[in-house]
Amino acid sequence: MEYTNMMELNFLSKSQNESFARTVVAAFAAQLDPTIEEIADIKTAVSEAVTNCIIHGYENKIGIITIKAFISGNKITIEVIDEGKGIEDIEKAMQPLFTTRLEEERAGMGFTVMQTFMDELEVESTPGKGTLVRMTKYIGSDK
């Protein structure tokens, strides 16, 4: 991946760190001069990805979450990575309302939210080894 700037952040899979993570990524994205709406989209998608790591990847146990962000031209690509339990069936997990946690509020909407607010979404996962969620947002009108 070619890029003109990048950052990497590691933090514990604690819910208190979710707002910290989205704020760091939003600050990094600010160099692209996004609109308030574009920043809100990025923050929402990062929040969903980090929350998925905490709840599903690590099942509320402590592990490390890594966020990498890359800027190239007018786009930002964000990778949210965990070394948790992984996803058995990515296609099924990405279906709206699919959840393994029926008791959770907004269950089954994480990937749908990420797809809605970002321009591209890719998920790579190996059961027992972890998951990488890669999201791309084009800032401005040229995609």
UniProtKB/Swiss-Prot annotation:
Primary enzyme class: transferase
Coiled coil: none
Sample GO molecular function, one term: ATP binding
Entry keyword ATP-binding: yes
E.C. designation(s): 2.7.11.1
Pfam families: HATPase_c_2
Highest taxon above the source species: Bacteria
Reaction(s) catalysed by this chain's protein: L-seryl-[protein] + ATP = O-phospho-L-seryl-[protein] + ADP + H(+); L-threonyl-[protein] + ATP = O-phospho-L-threonyl-[protein] + ADP + H(+)
GO biological process, one term: sporulation resulting in formation of a cellular spore
Record keywords, A-Z: ATP-binding, Kinase, Nucleotide-binding, Serine/threonine-protein kinase, Sporulation, Transferase
ATP-binding found in the keyword field: yes
Family: Belongs to the anti-sigma-factor family.
Its job: Binds to sigma F and blocks its ability to form an RNA polymerase holoenzyme (E-sigma F). Phosphorylates SpoIIAA on a serine residue. This phosphorylation may enable SpoIIAA to act as an anti-anti-sigma factor that counteracts SpoIIAB and thus releases sigma F from inhibition.
Name this polypeptide is given: Anti-sigma F factor
Organism: Thermoanaerobacter pseudethanolicus (strain ATCC 33223 / 39E) (Clostridium thermohydrosulfuricum)
Species classification: Bacteria, Bacillati, Bacillota, Clostridia, Thermoanaerobacterales
